[in-house]
Amino acid sequence: MEDNHQYRLACASWSMLTEAEDLAADLLLSELGPVAALKIARRAASDDPERWHRYLPVELVRRSGGDKWDKSFSRWRGRLEALDLPALEKMLSRGRFKLVTRRDPDWPAAFTNVANAPWALWAIGDTSLLNQESEKTVAMVGARAVSNLGHDIATELAWRCAGEGMTLVSGGAYGVDCLVHQACLRAKTPTISLLAGGLDRPYPAMNSQMFKQISRSGLLLSQYPPGSRPTRWRFLDRNRLIAALSAATVVIQAGFRSGALNTARHGMELGRQVGAVPGPINQPEWAGSNQLIRDGATLISSAEDVQEMIAPLGTVTSERTRVQAGYLDGLDPLSARILDATPLRSPANASAIARASGAAIEEVLSIMGNLEMDGRVIQLDGKWKKAGV
């Protein structure tokens, strides 16, 4: 097994050679490891392009097809020829930019089941934020050209979520992204900003002072190495990383063509929770947010809604539940436990409620019928939530 120094240098090299979600690179690194894969790629780059496949394991070529590798090596060749390993090694040793790899304790556990996740992340700031309790990390995104209403909602919601101990993730752009980060900075809570280029080229430049503040109290992060230019396709790839890093994505003010919807779609594809703040039905800049809710996203109107969306069932004690005195009155202990574990807004199935309450699924199904007749729960497509709360 290669030593850690070689491994880190190879991971950094591959971040320079490839763009996000390079399927061939991910396959090669998964099969051979970053160090061996880099050696093969460098040898192949110096040979005739038609002979590149001869450097790969025969079984790998047979399973994946030779044409795939011809195209991949063609993509990598220019960057392989320009790769300066001594200069890269020197940059890593200076320590201005941290490199987080899959071997590091700070590598995000949230990436465990994410297909084609990066092999390395570049960071400035507190990298321990990457591997904290996953349910505390929430992406909050929205329009760049934010309205007065969106401005007020983003500021208030981000402030309150930060106060509840959540770490908010966003993209550092104008509008909602910037408001979310600024609310966290004012609340003196850490925030993570995912950039679409190298950390030495933060974009937009007008937010440079904010990025400096984030690097001191939170984390600046990118899957692209220093020197990388922010480009349109990298912004789209960055959105996937924002969703992957977070337990949930909350969209605040998005039109039908907003990049925030791209982040939300990535979240859905990754099996993450997605919520949206509703807006006026006659304003097109809110049409995307409203459509998300229509398509099944959780309606978000408060920090409590966000907390309930991301927390395991039965772990959130809602203020609305506490003030509704006597909602468990007249129930036997098992029924009370099952009702207490039933969520307020997002319906849950019998299996989830059974896990949260410690009851058997059969007990949940039996008792839910009685609770529904009493008007204490509502059934929606085979799932339940509390009624009248």
Q: Would you name each region that the model predicts?
A:
Residues M1-R8, M16-E19, S93-G95, L99-V389:
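Glycine-biased, small-residue-rich flexible motifs in mid-sequence functional cores and linkers
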